[in-house]
């Protein structure tokens, strides 16, 4: 539910961390003088751990952020989404688990536990994740 007093929330429809969830106008962070809306308090906390990364990664979902203001020093990790929760973005500061010599990033410790139980299933599932096109990243 959006109120008339939050015009930015009307422009930004989706949470930049849980990219399939609608924003809650009461859950937001200030970033370089702009309000970025989230779907919940958990996303607010995660966002604050790596704001420049999340803004650059999900700038396509944030119409209030000018593309020229993105931090050019931020380098993306290869993995963009949690291996278990495919609609949740990860950053270099996310939970990490190594499997067969490769690092994988996760939304939570619960996601790591699920991954450990069926790693091959989640690795195959991640290869089919269609959420990447929502980020519209330039190569």
Please name every model-derived segment.
Residues 5-139:
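Intrinsically disordered, low-complexity terminal tails/loops enriched in metal-binding residues
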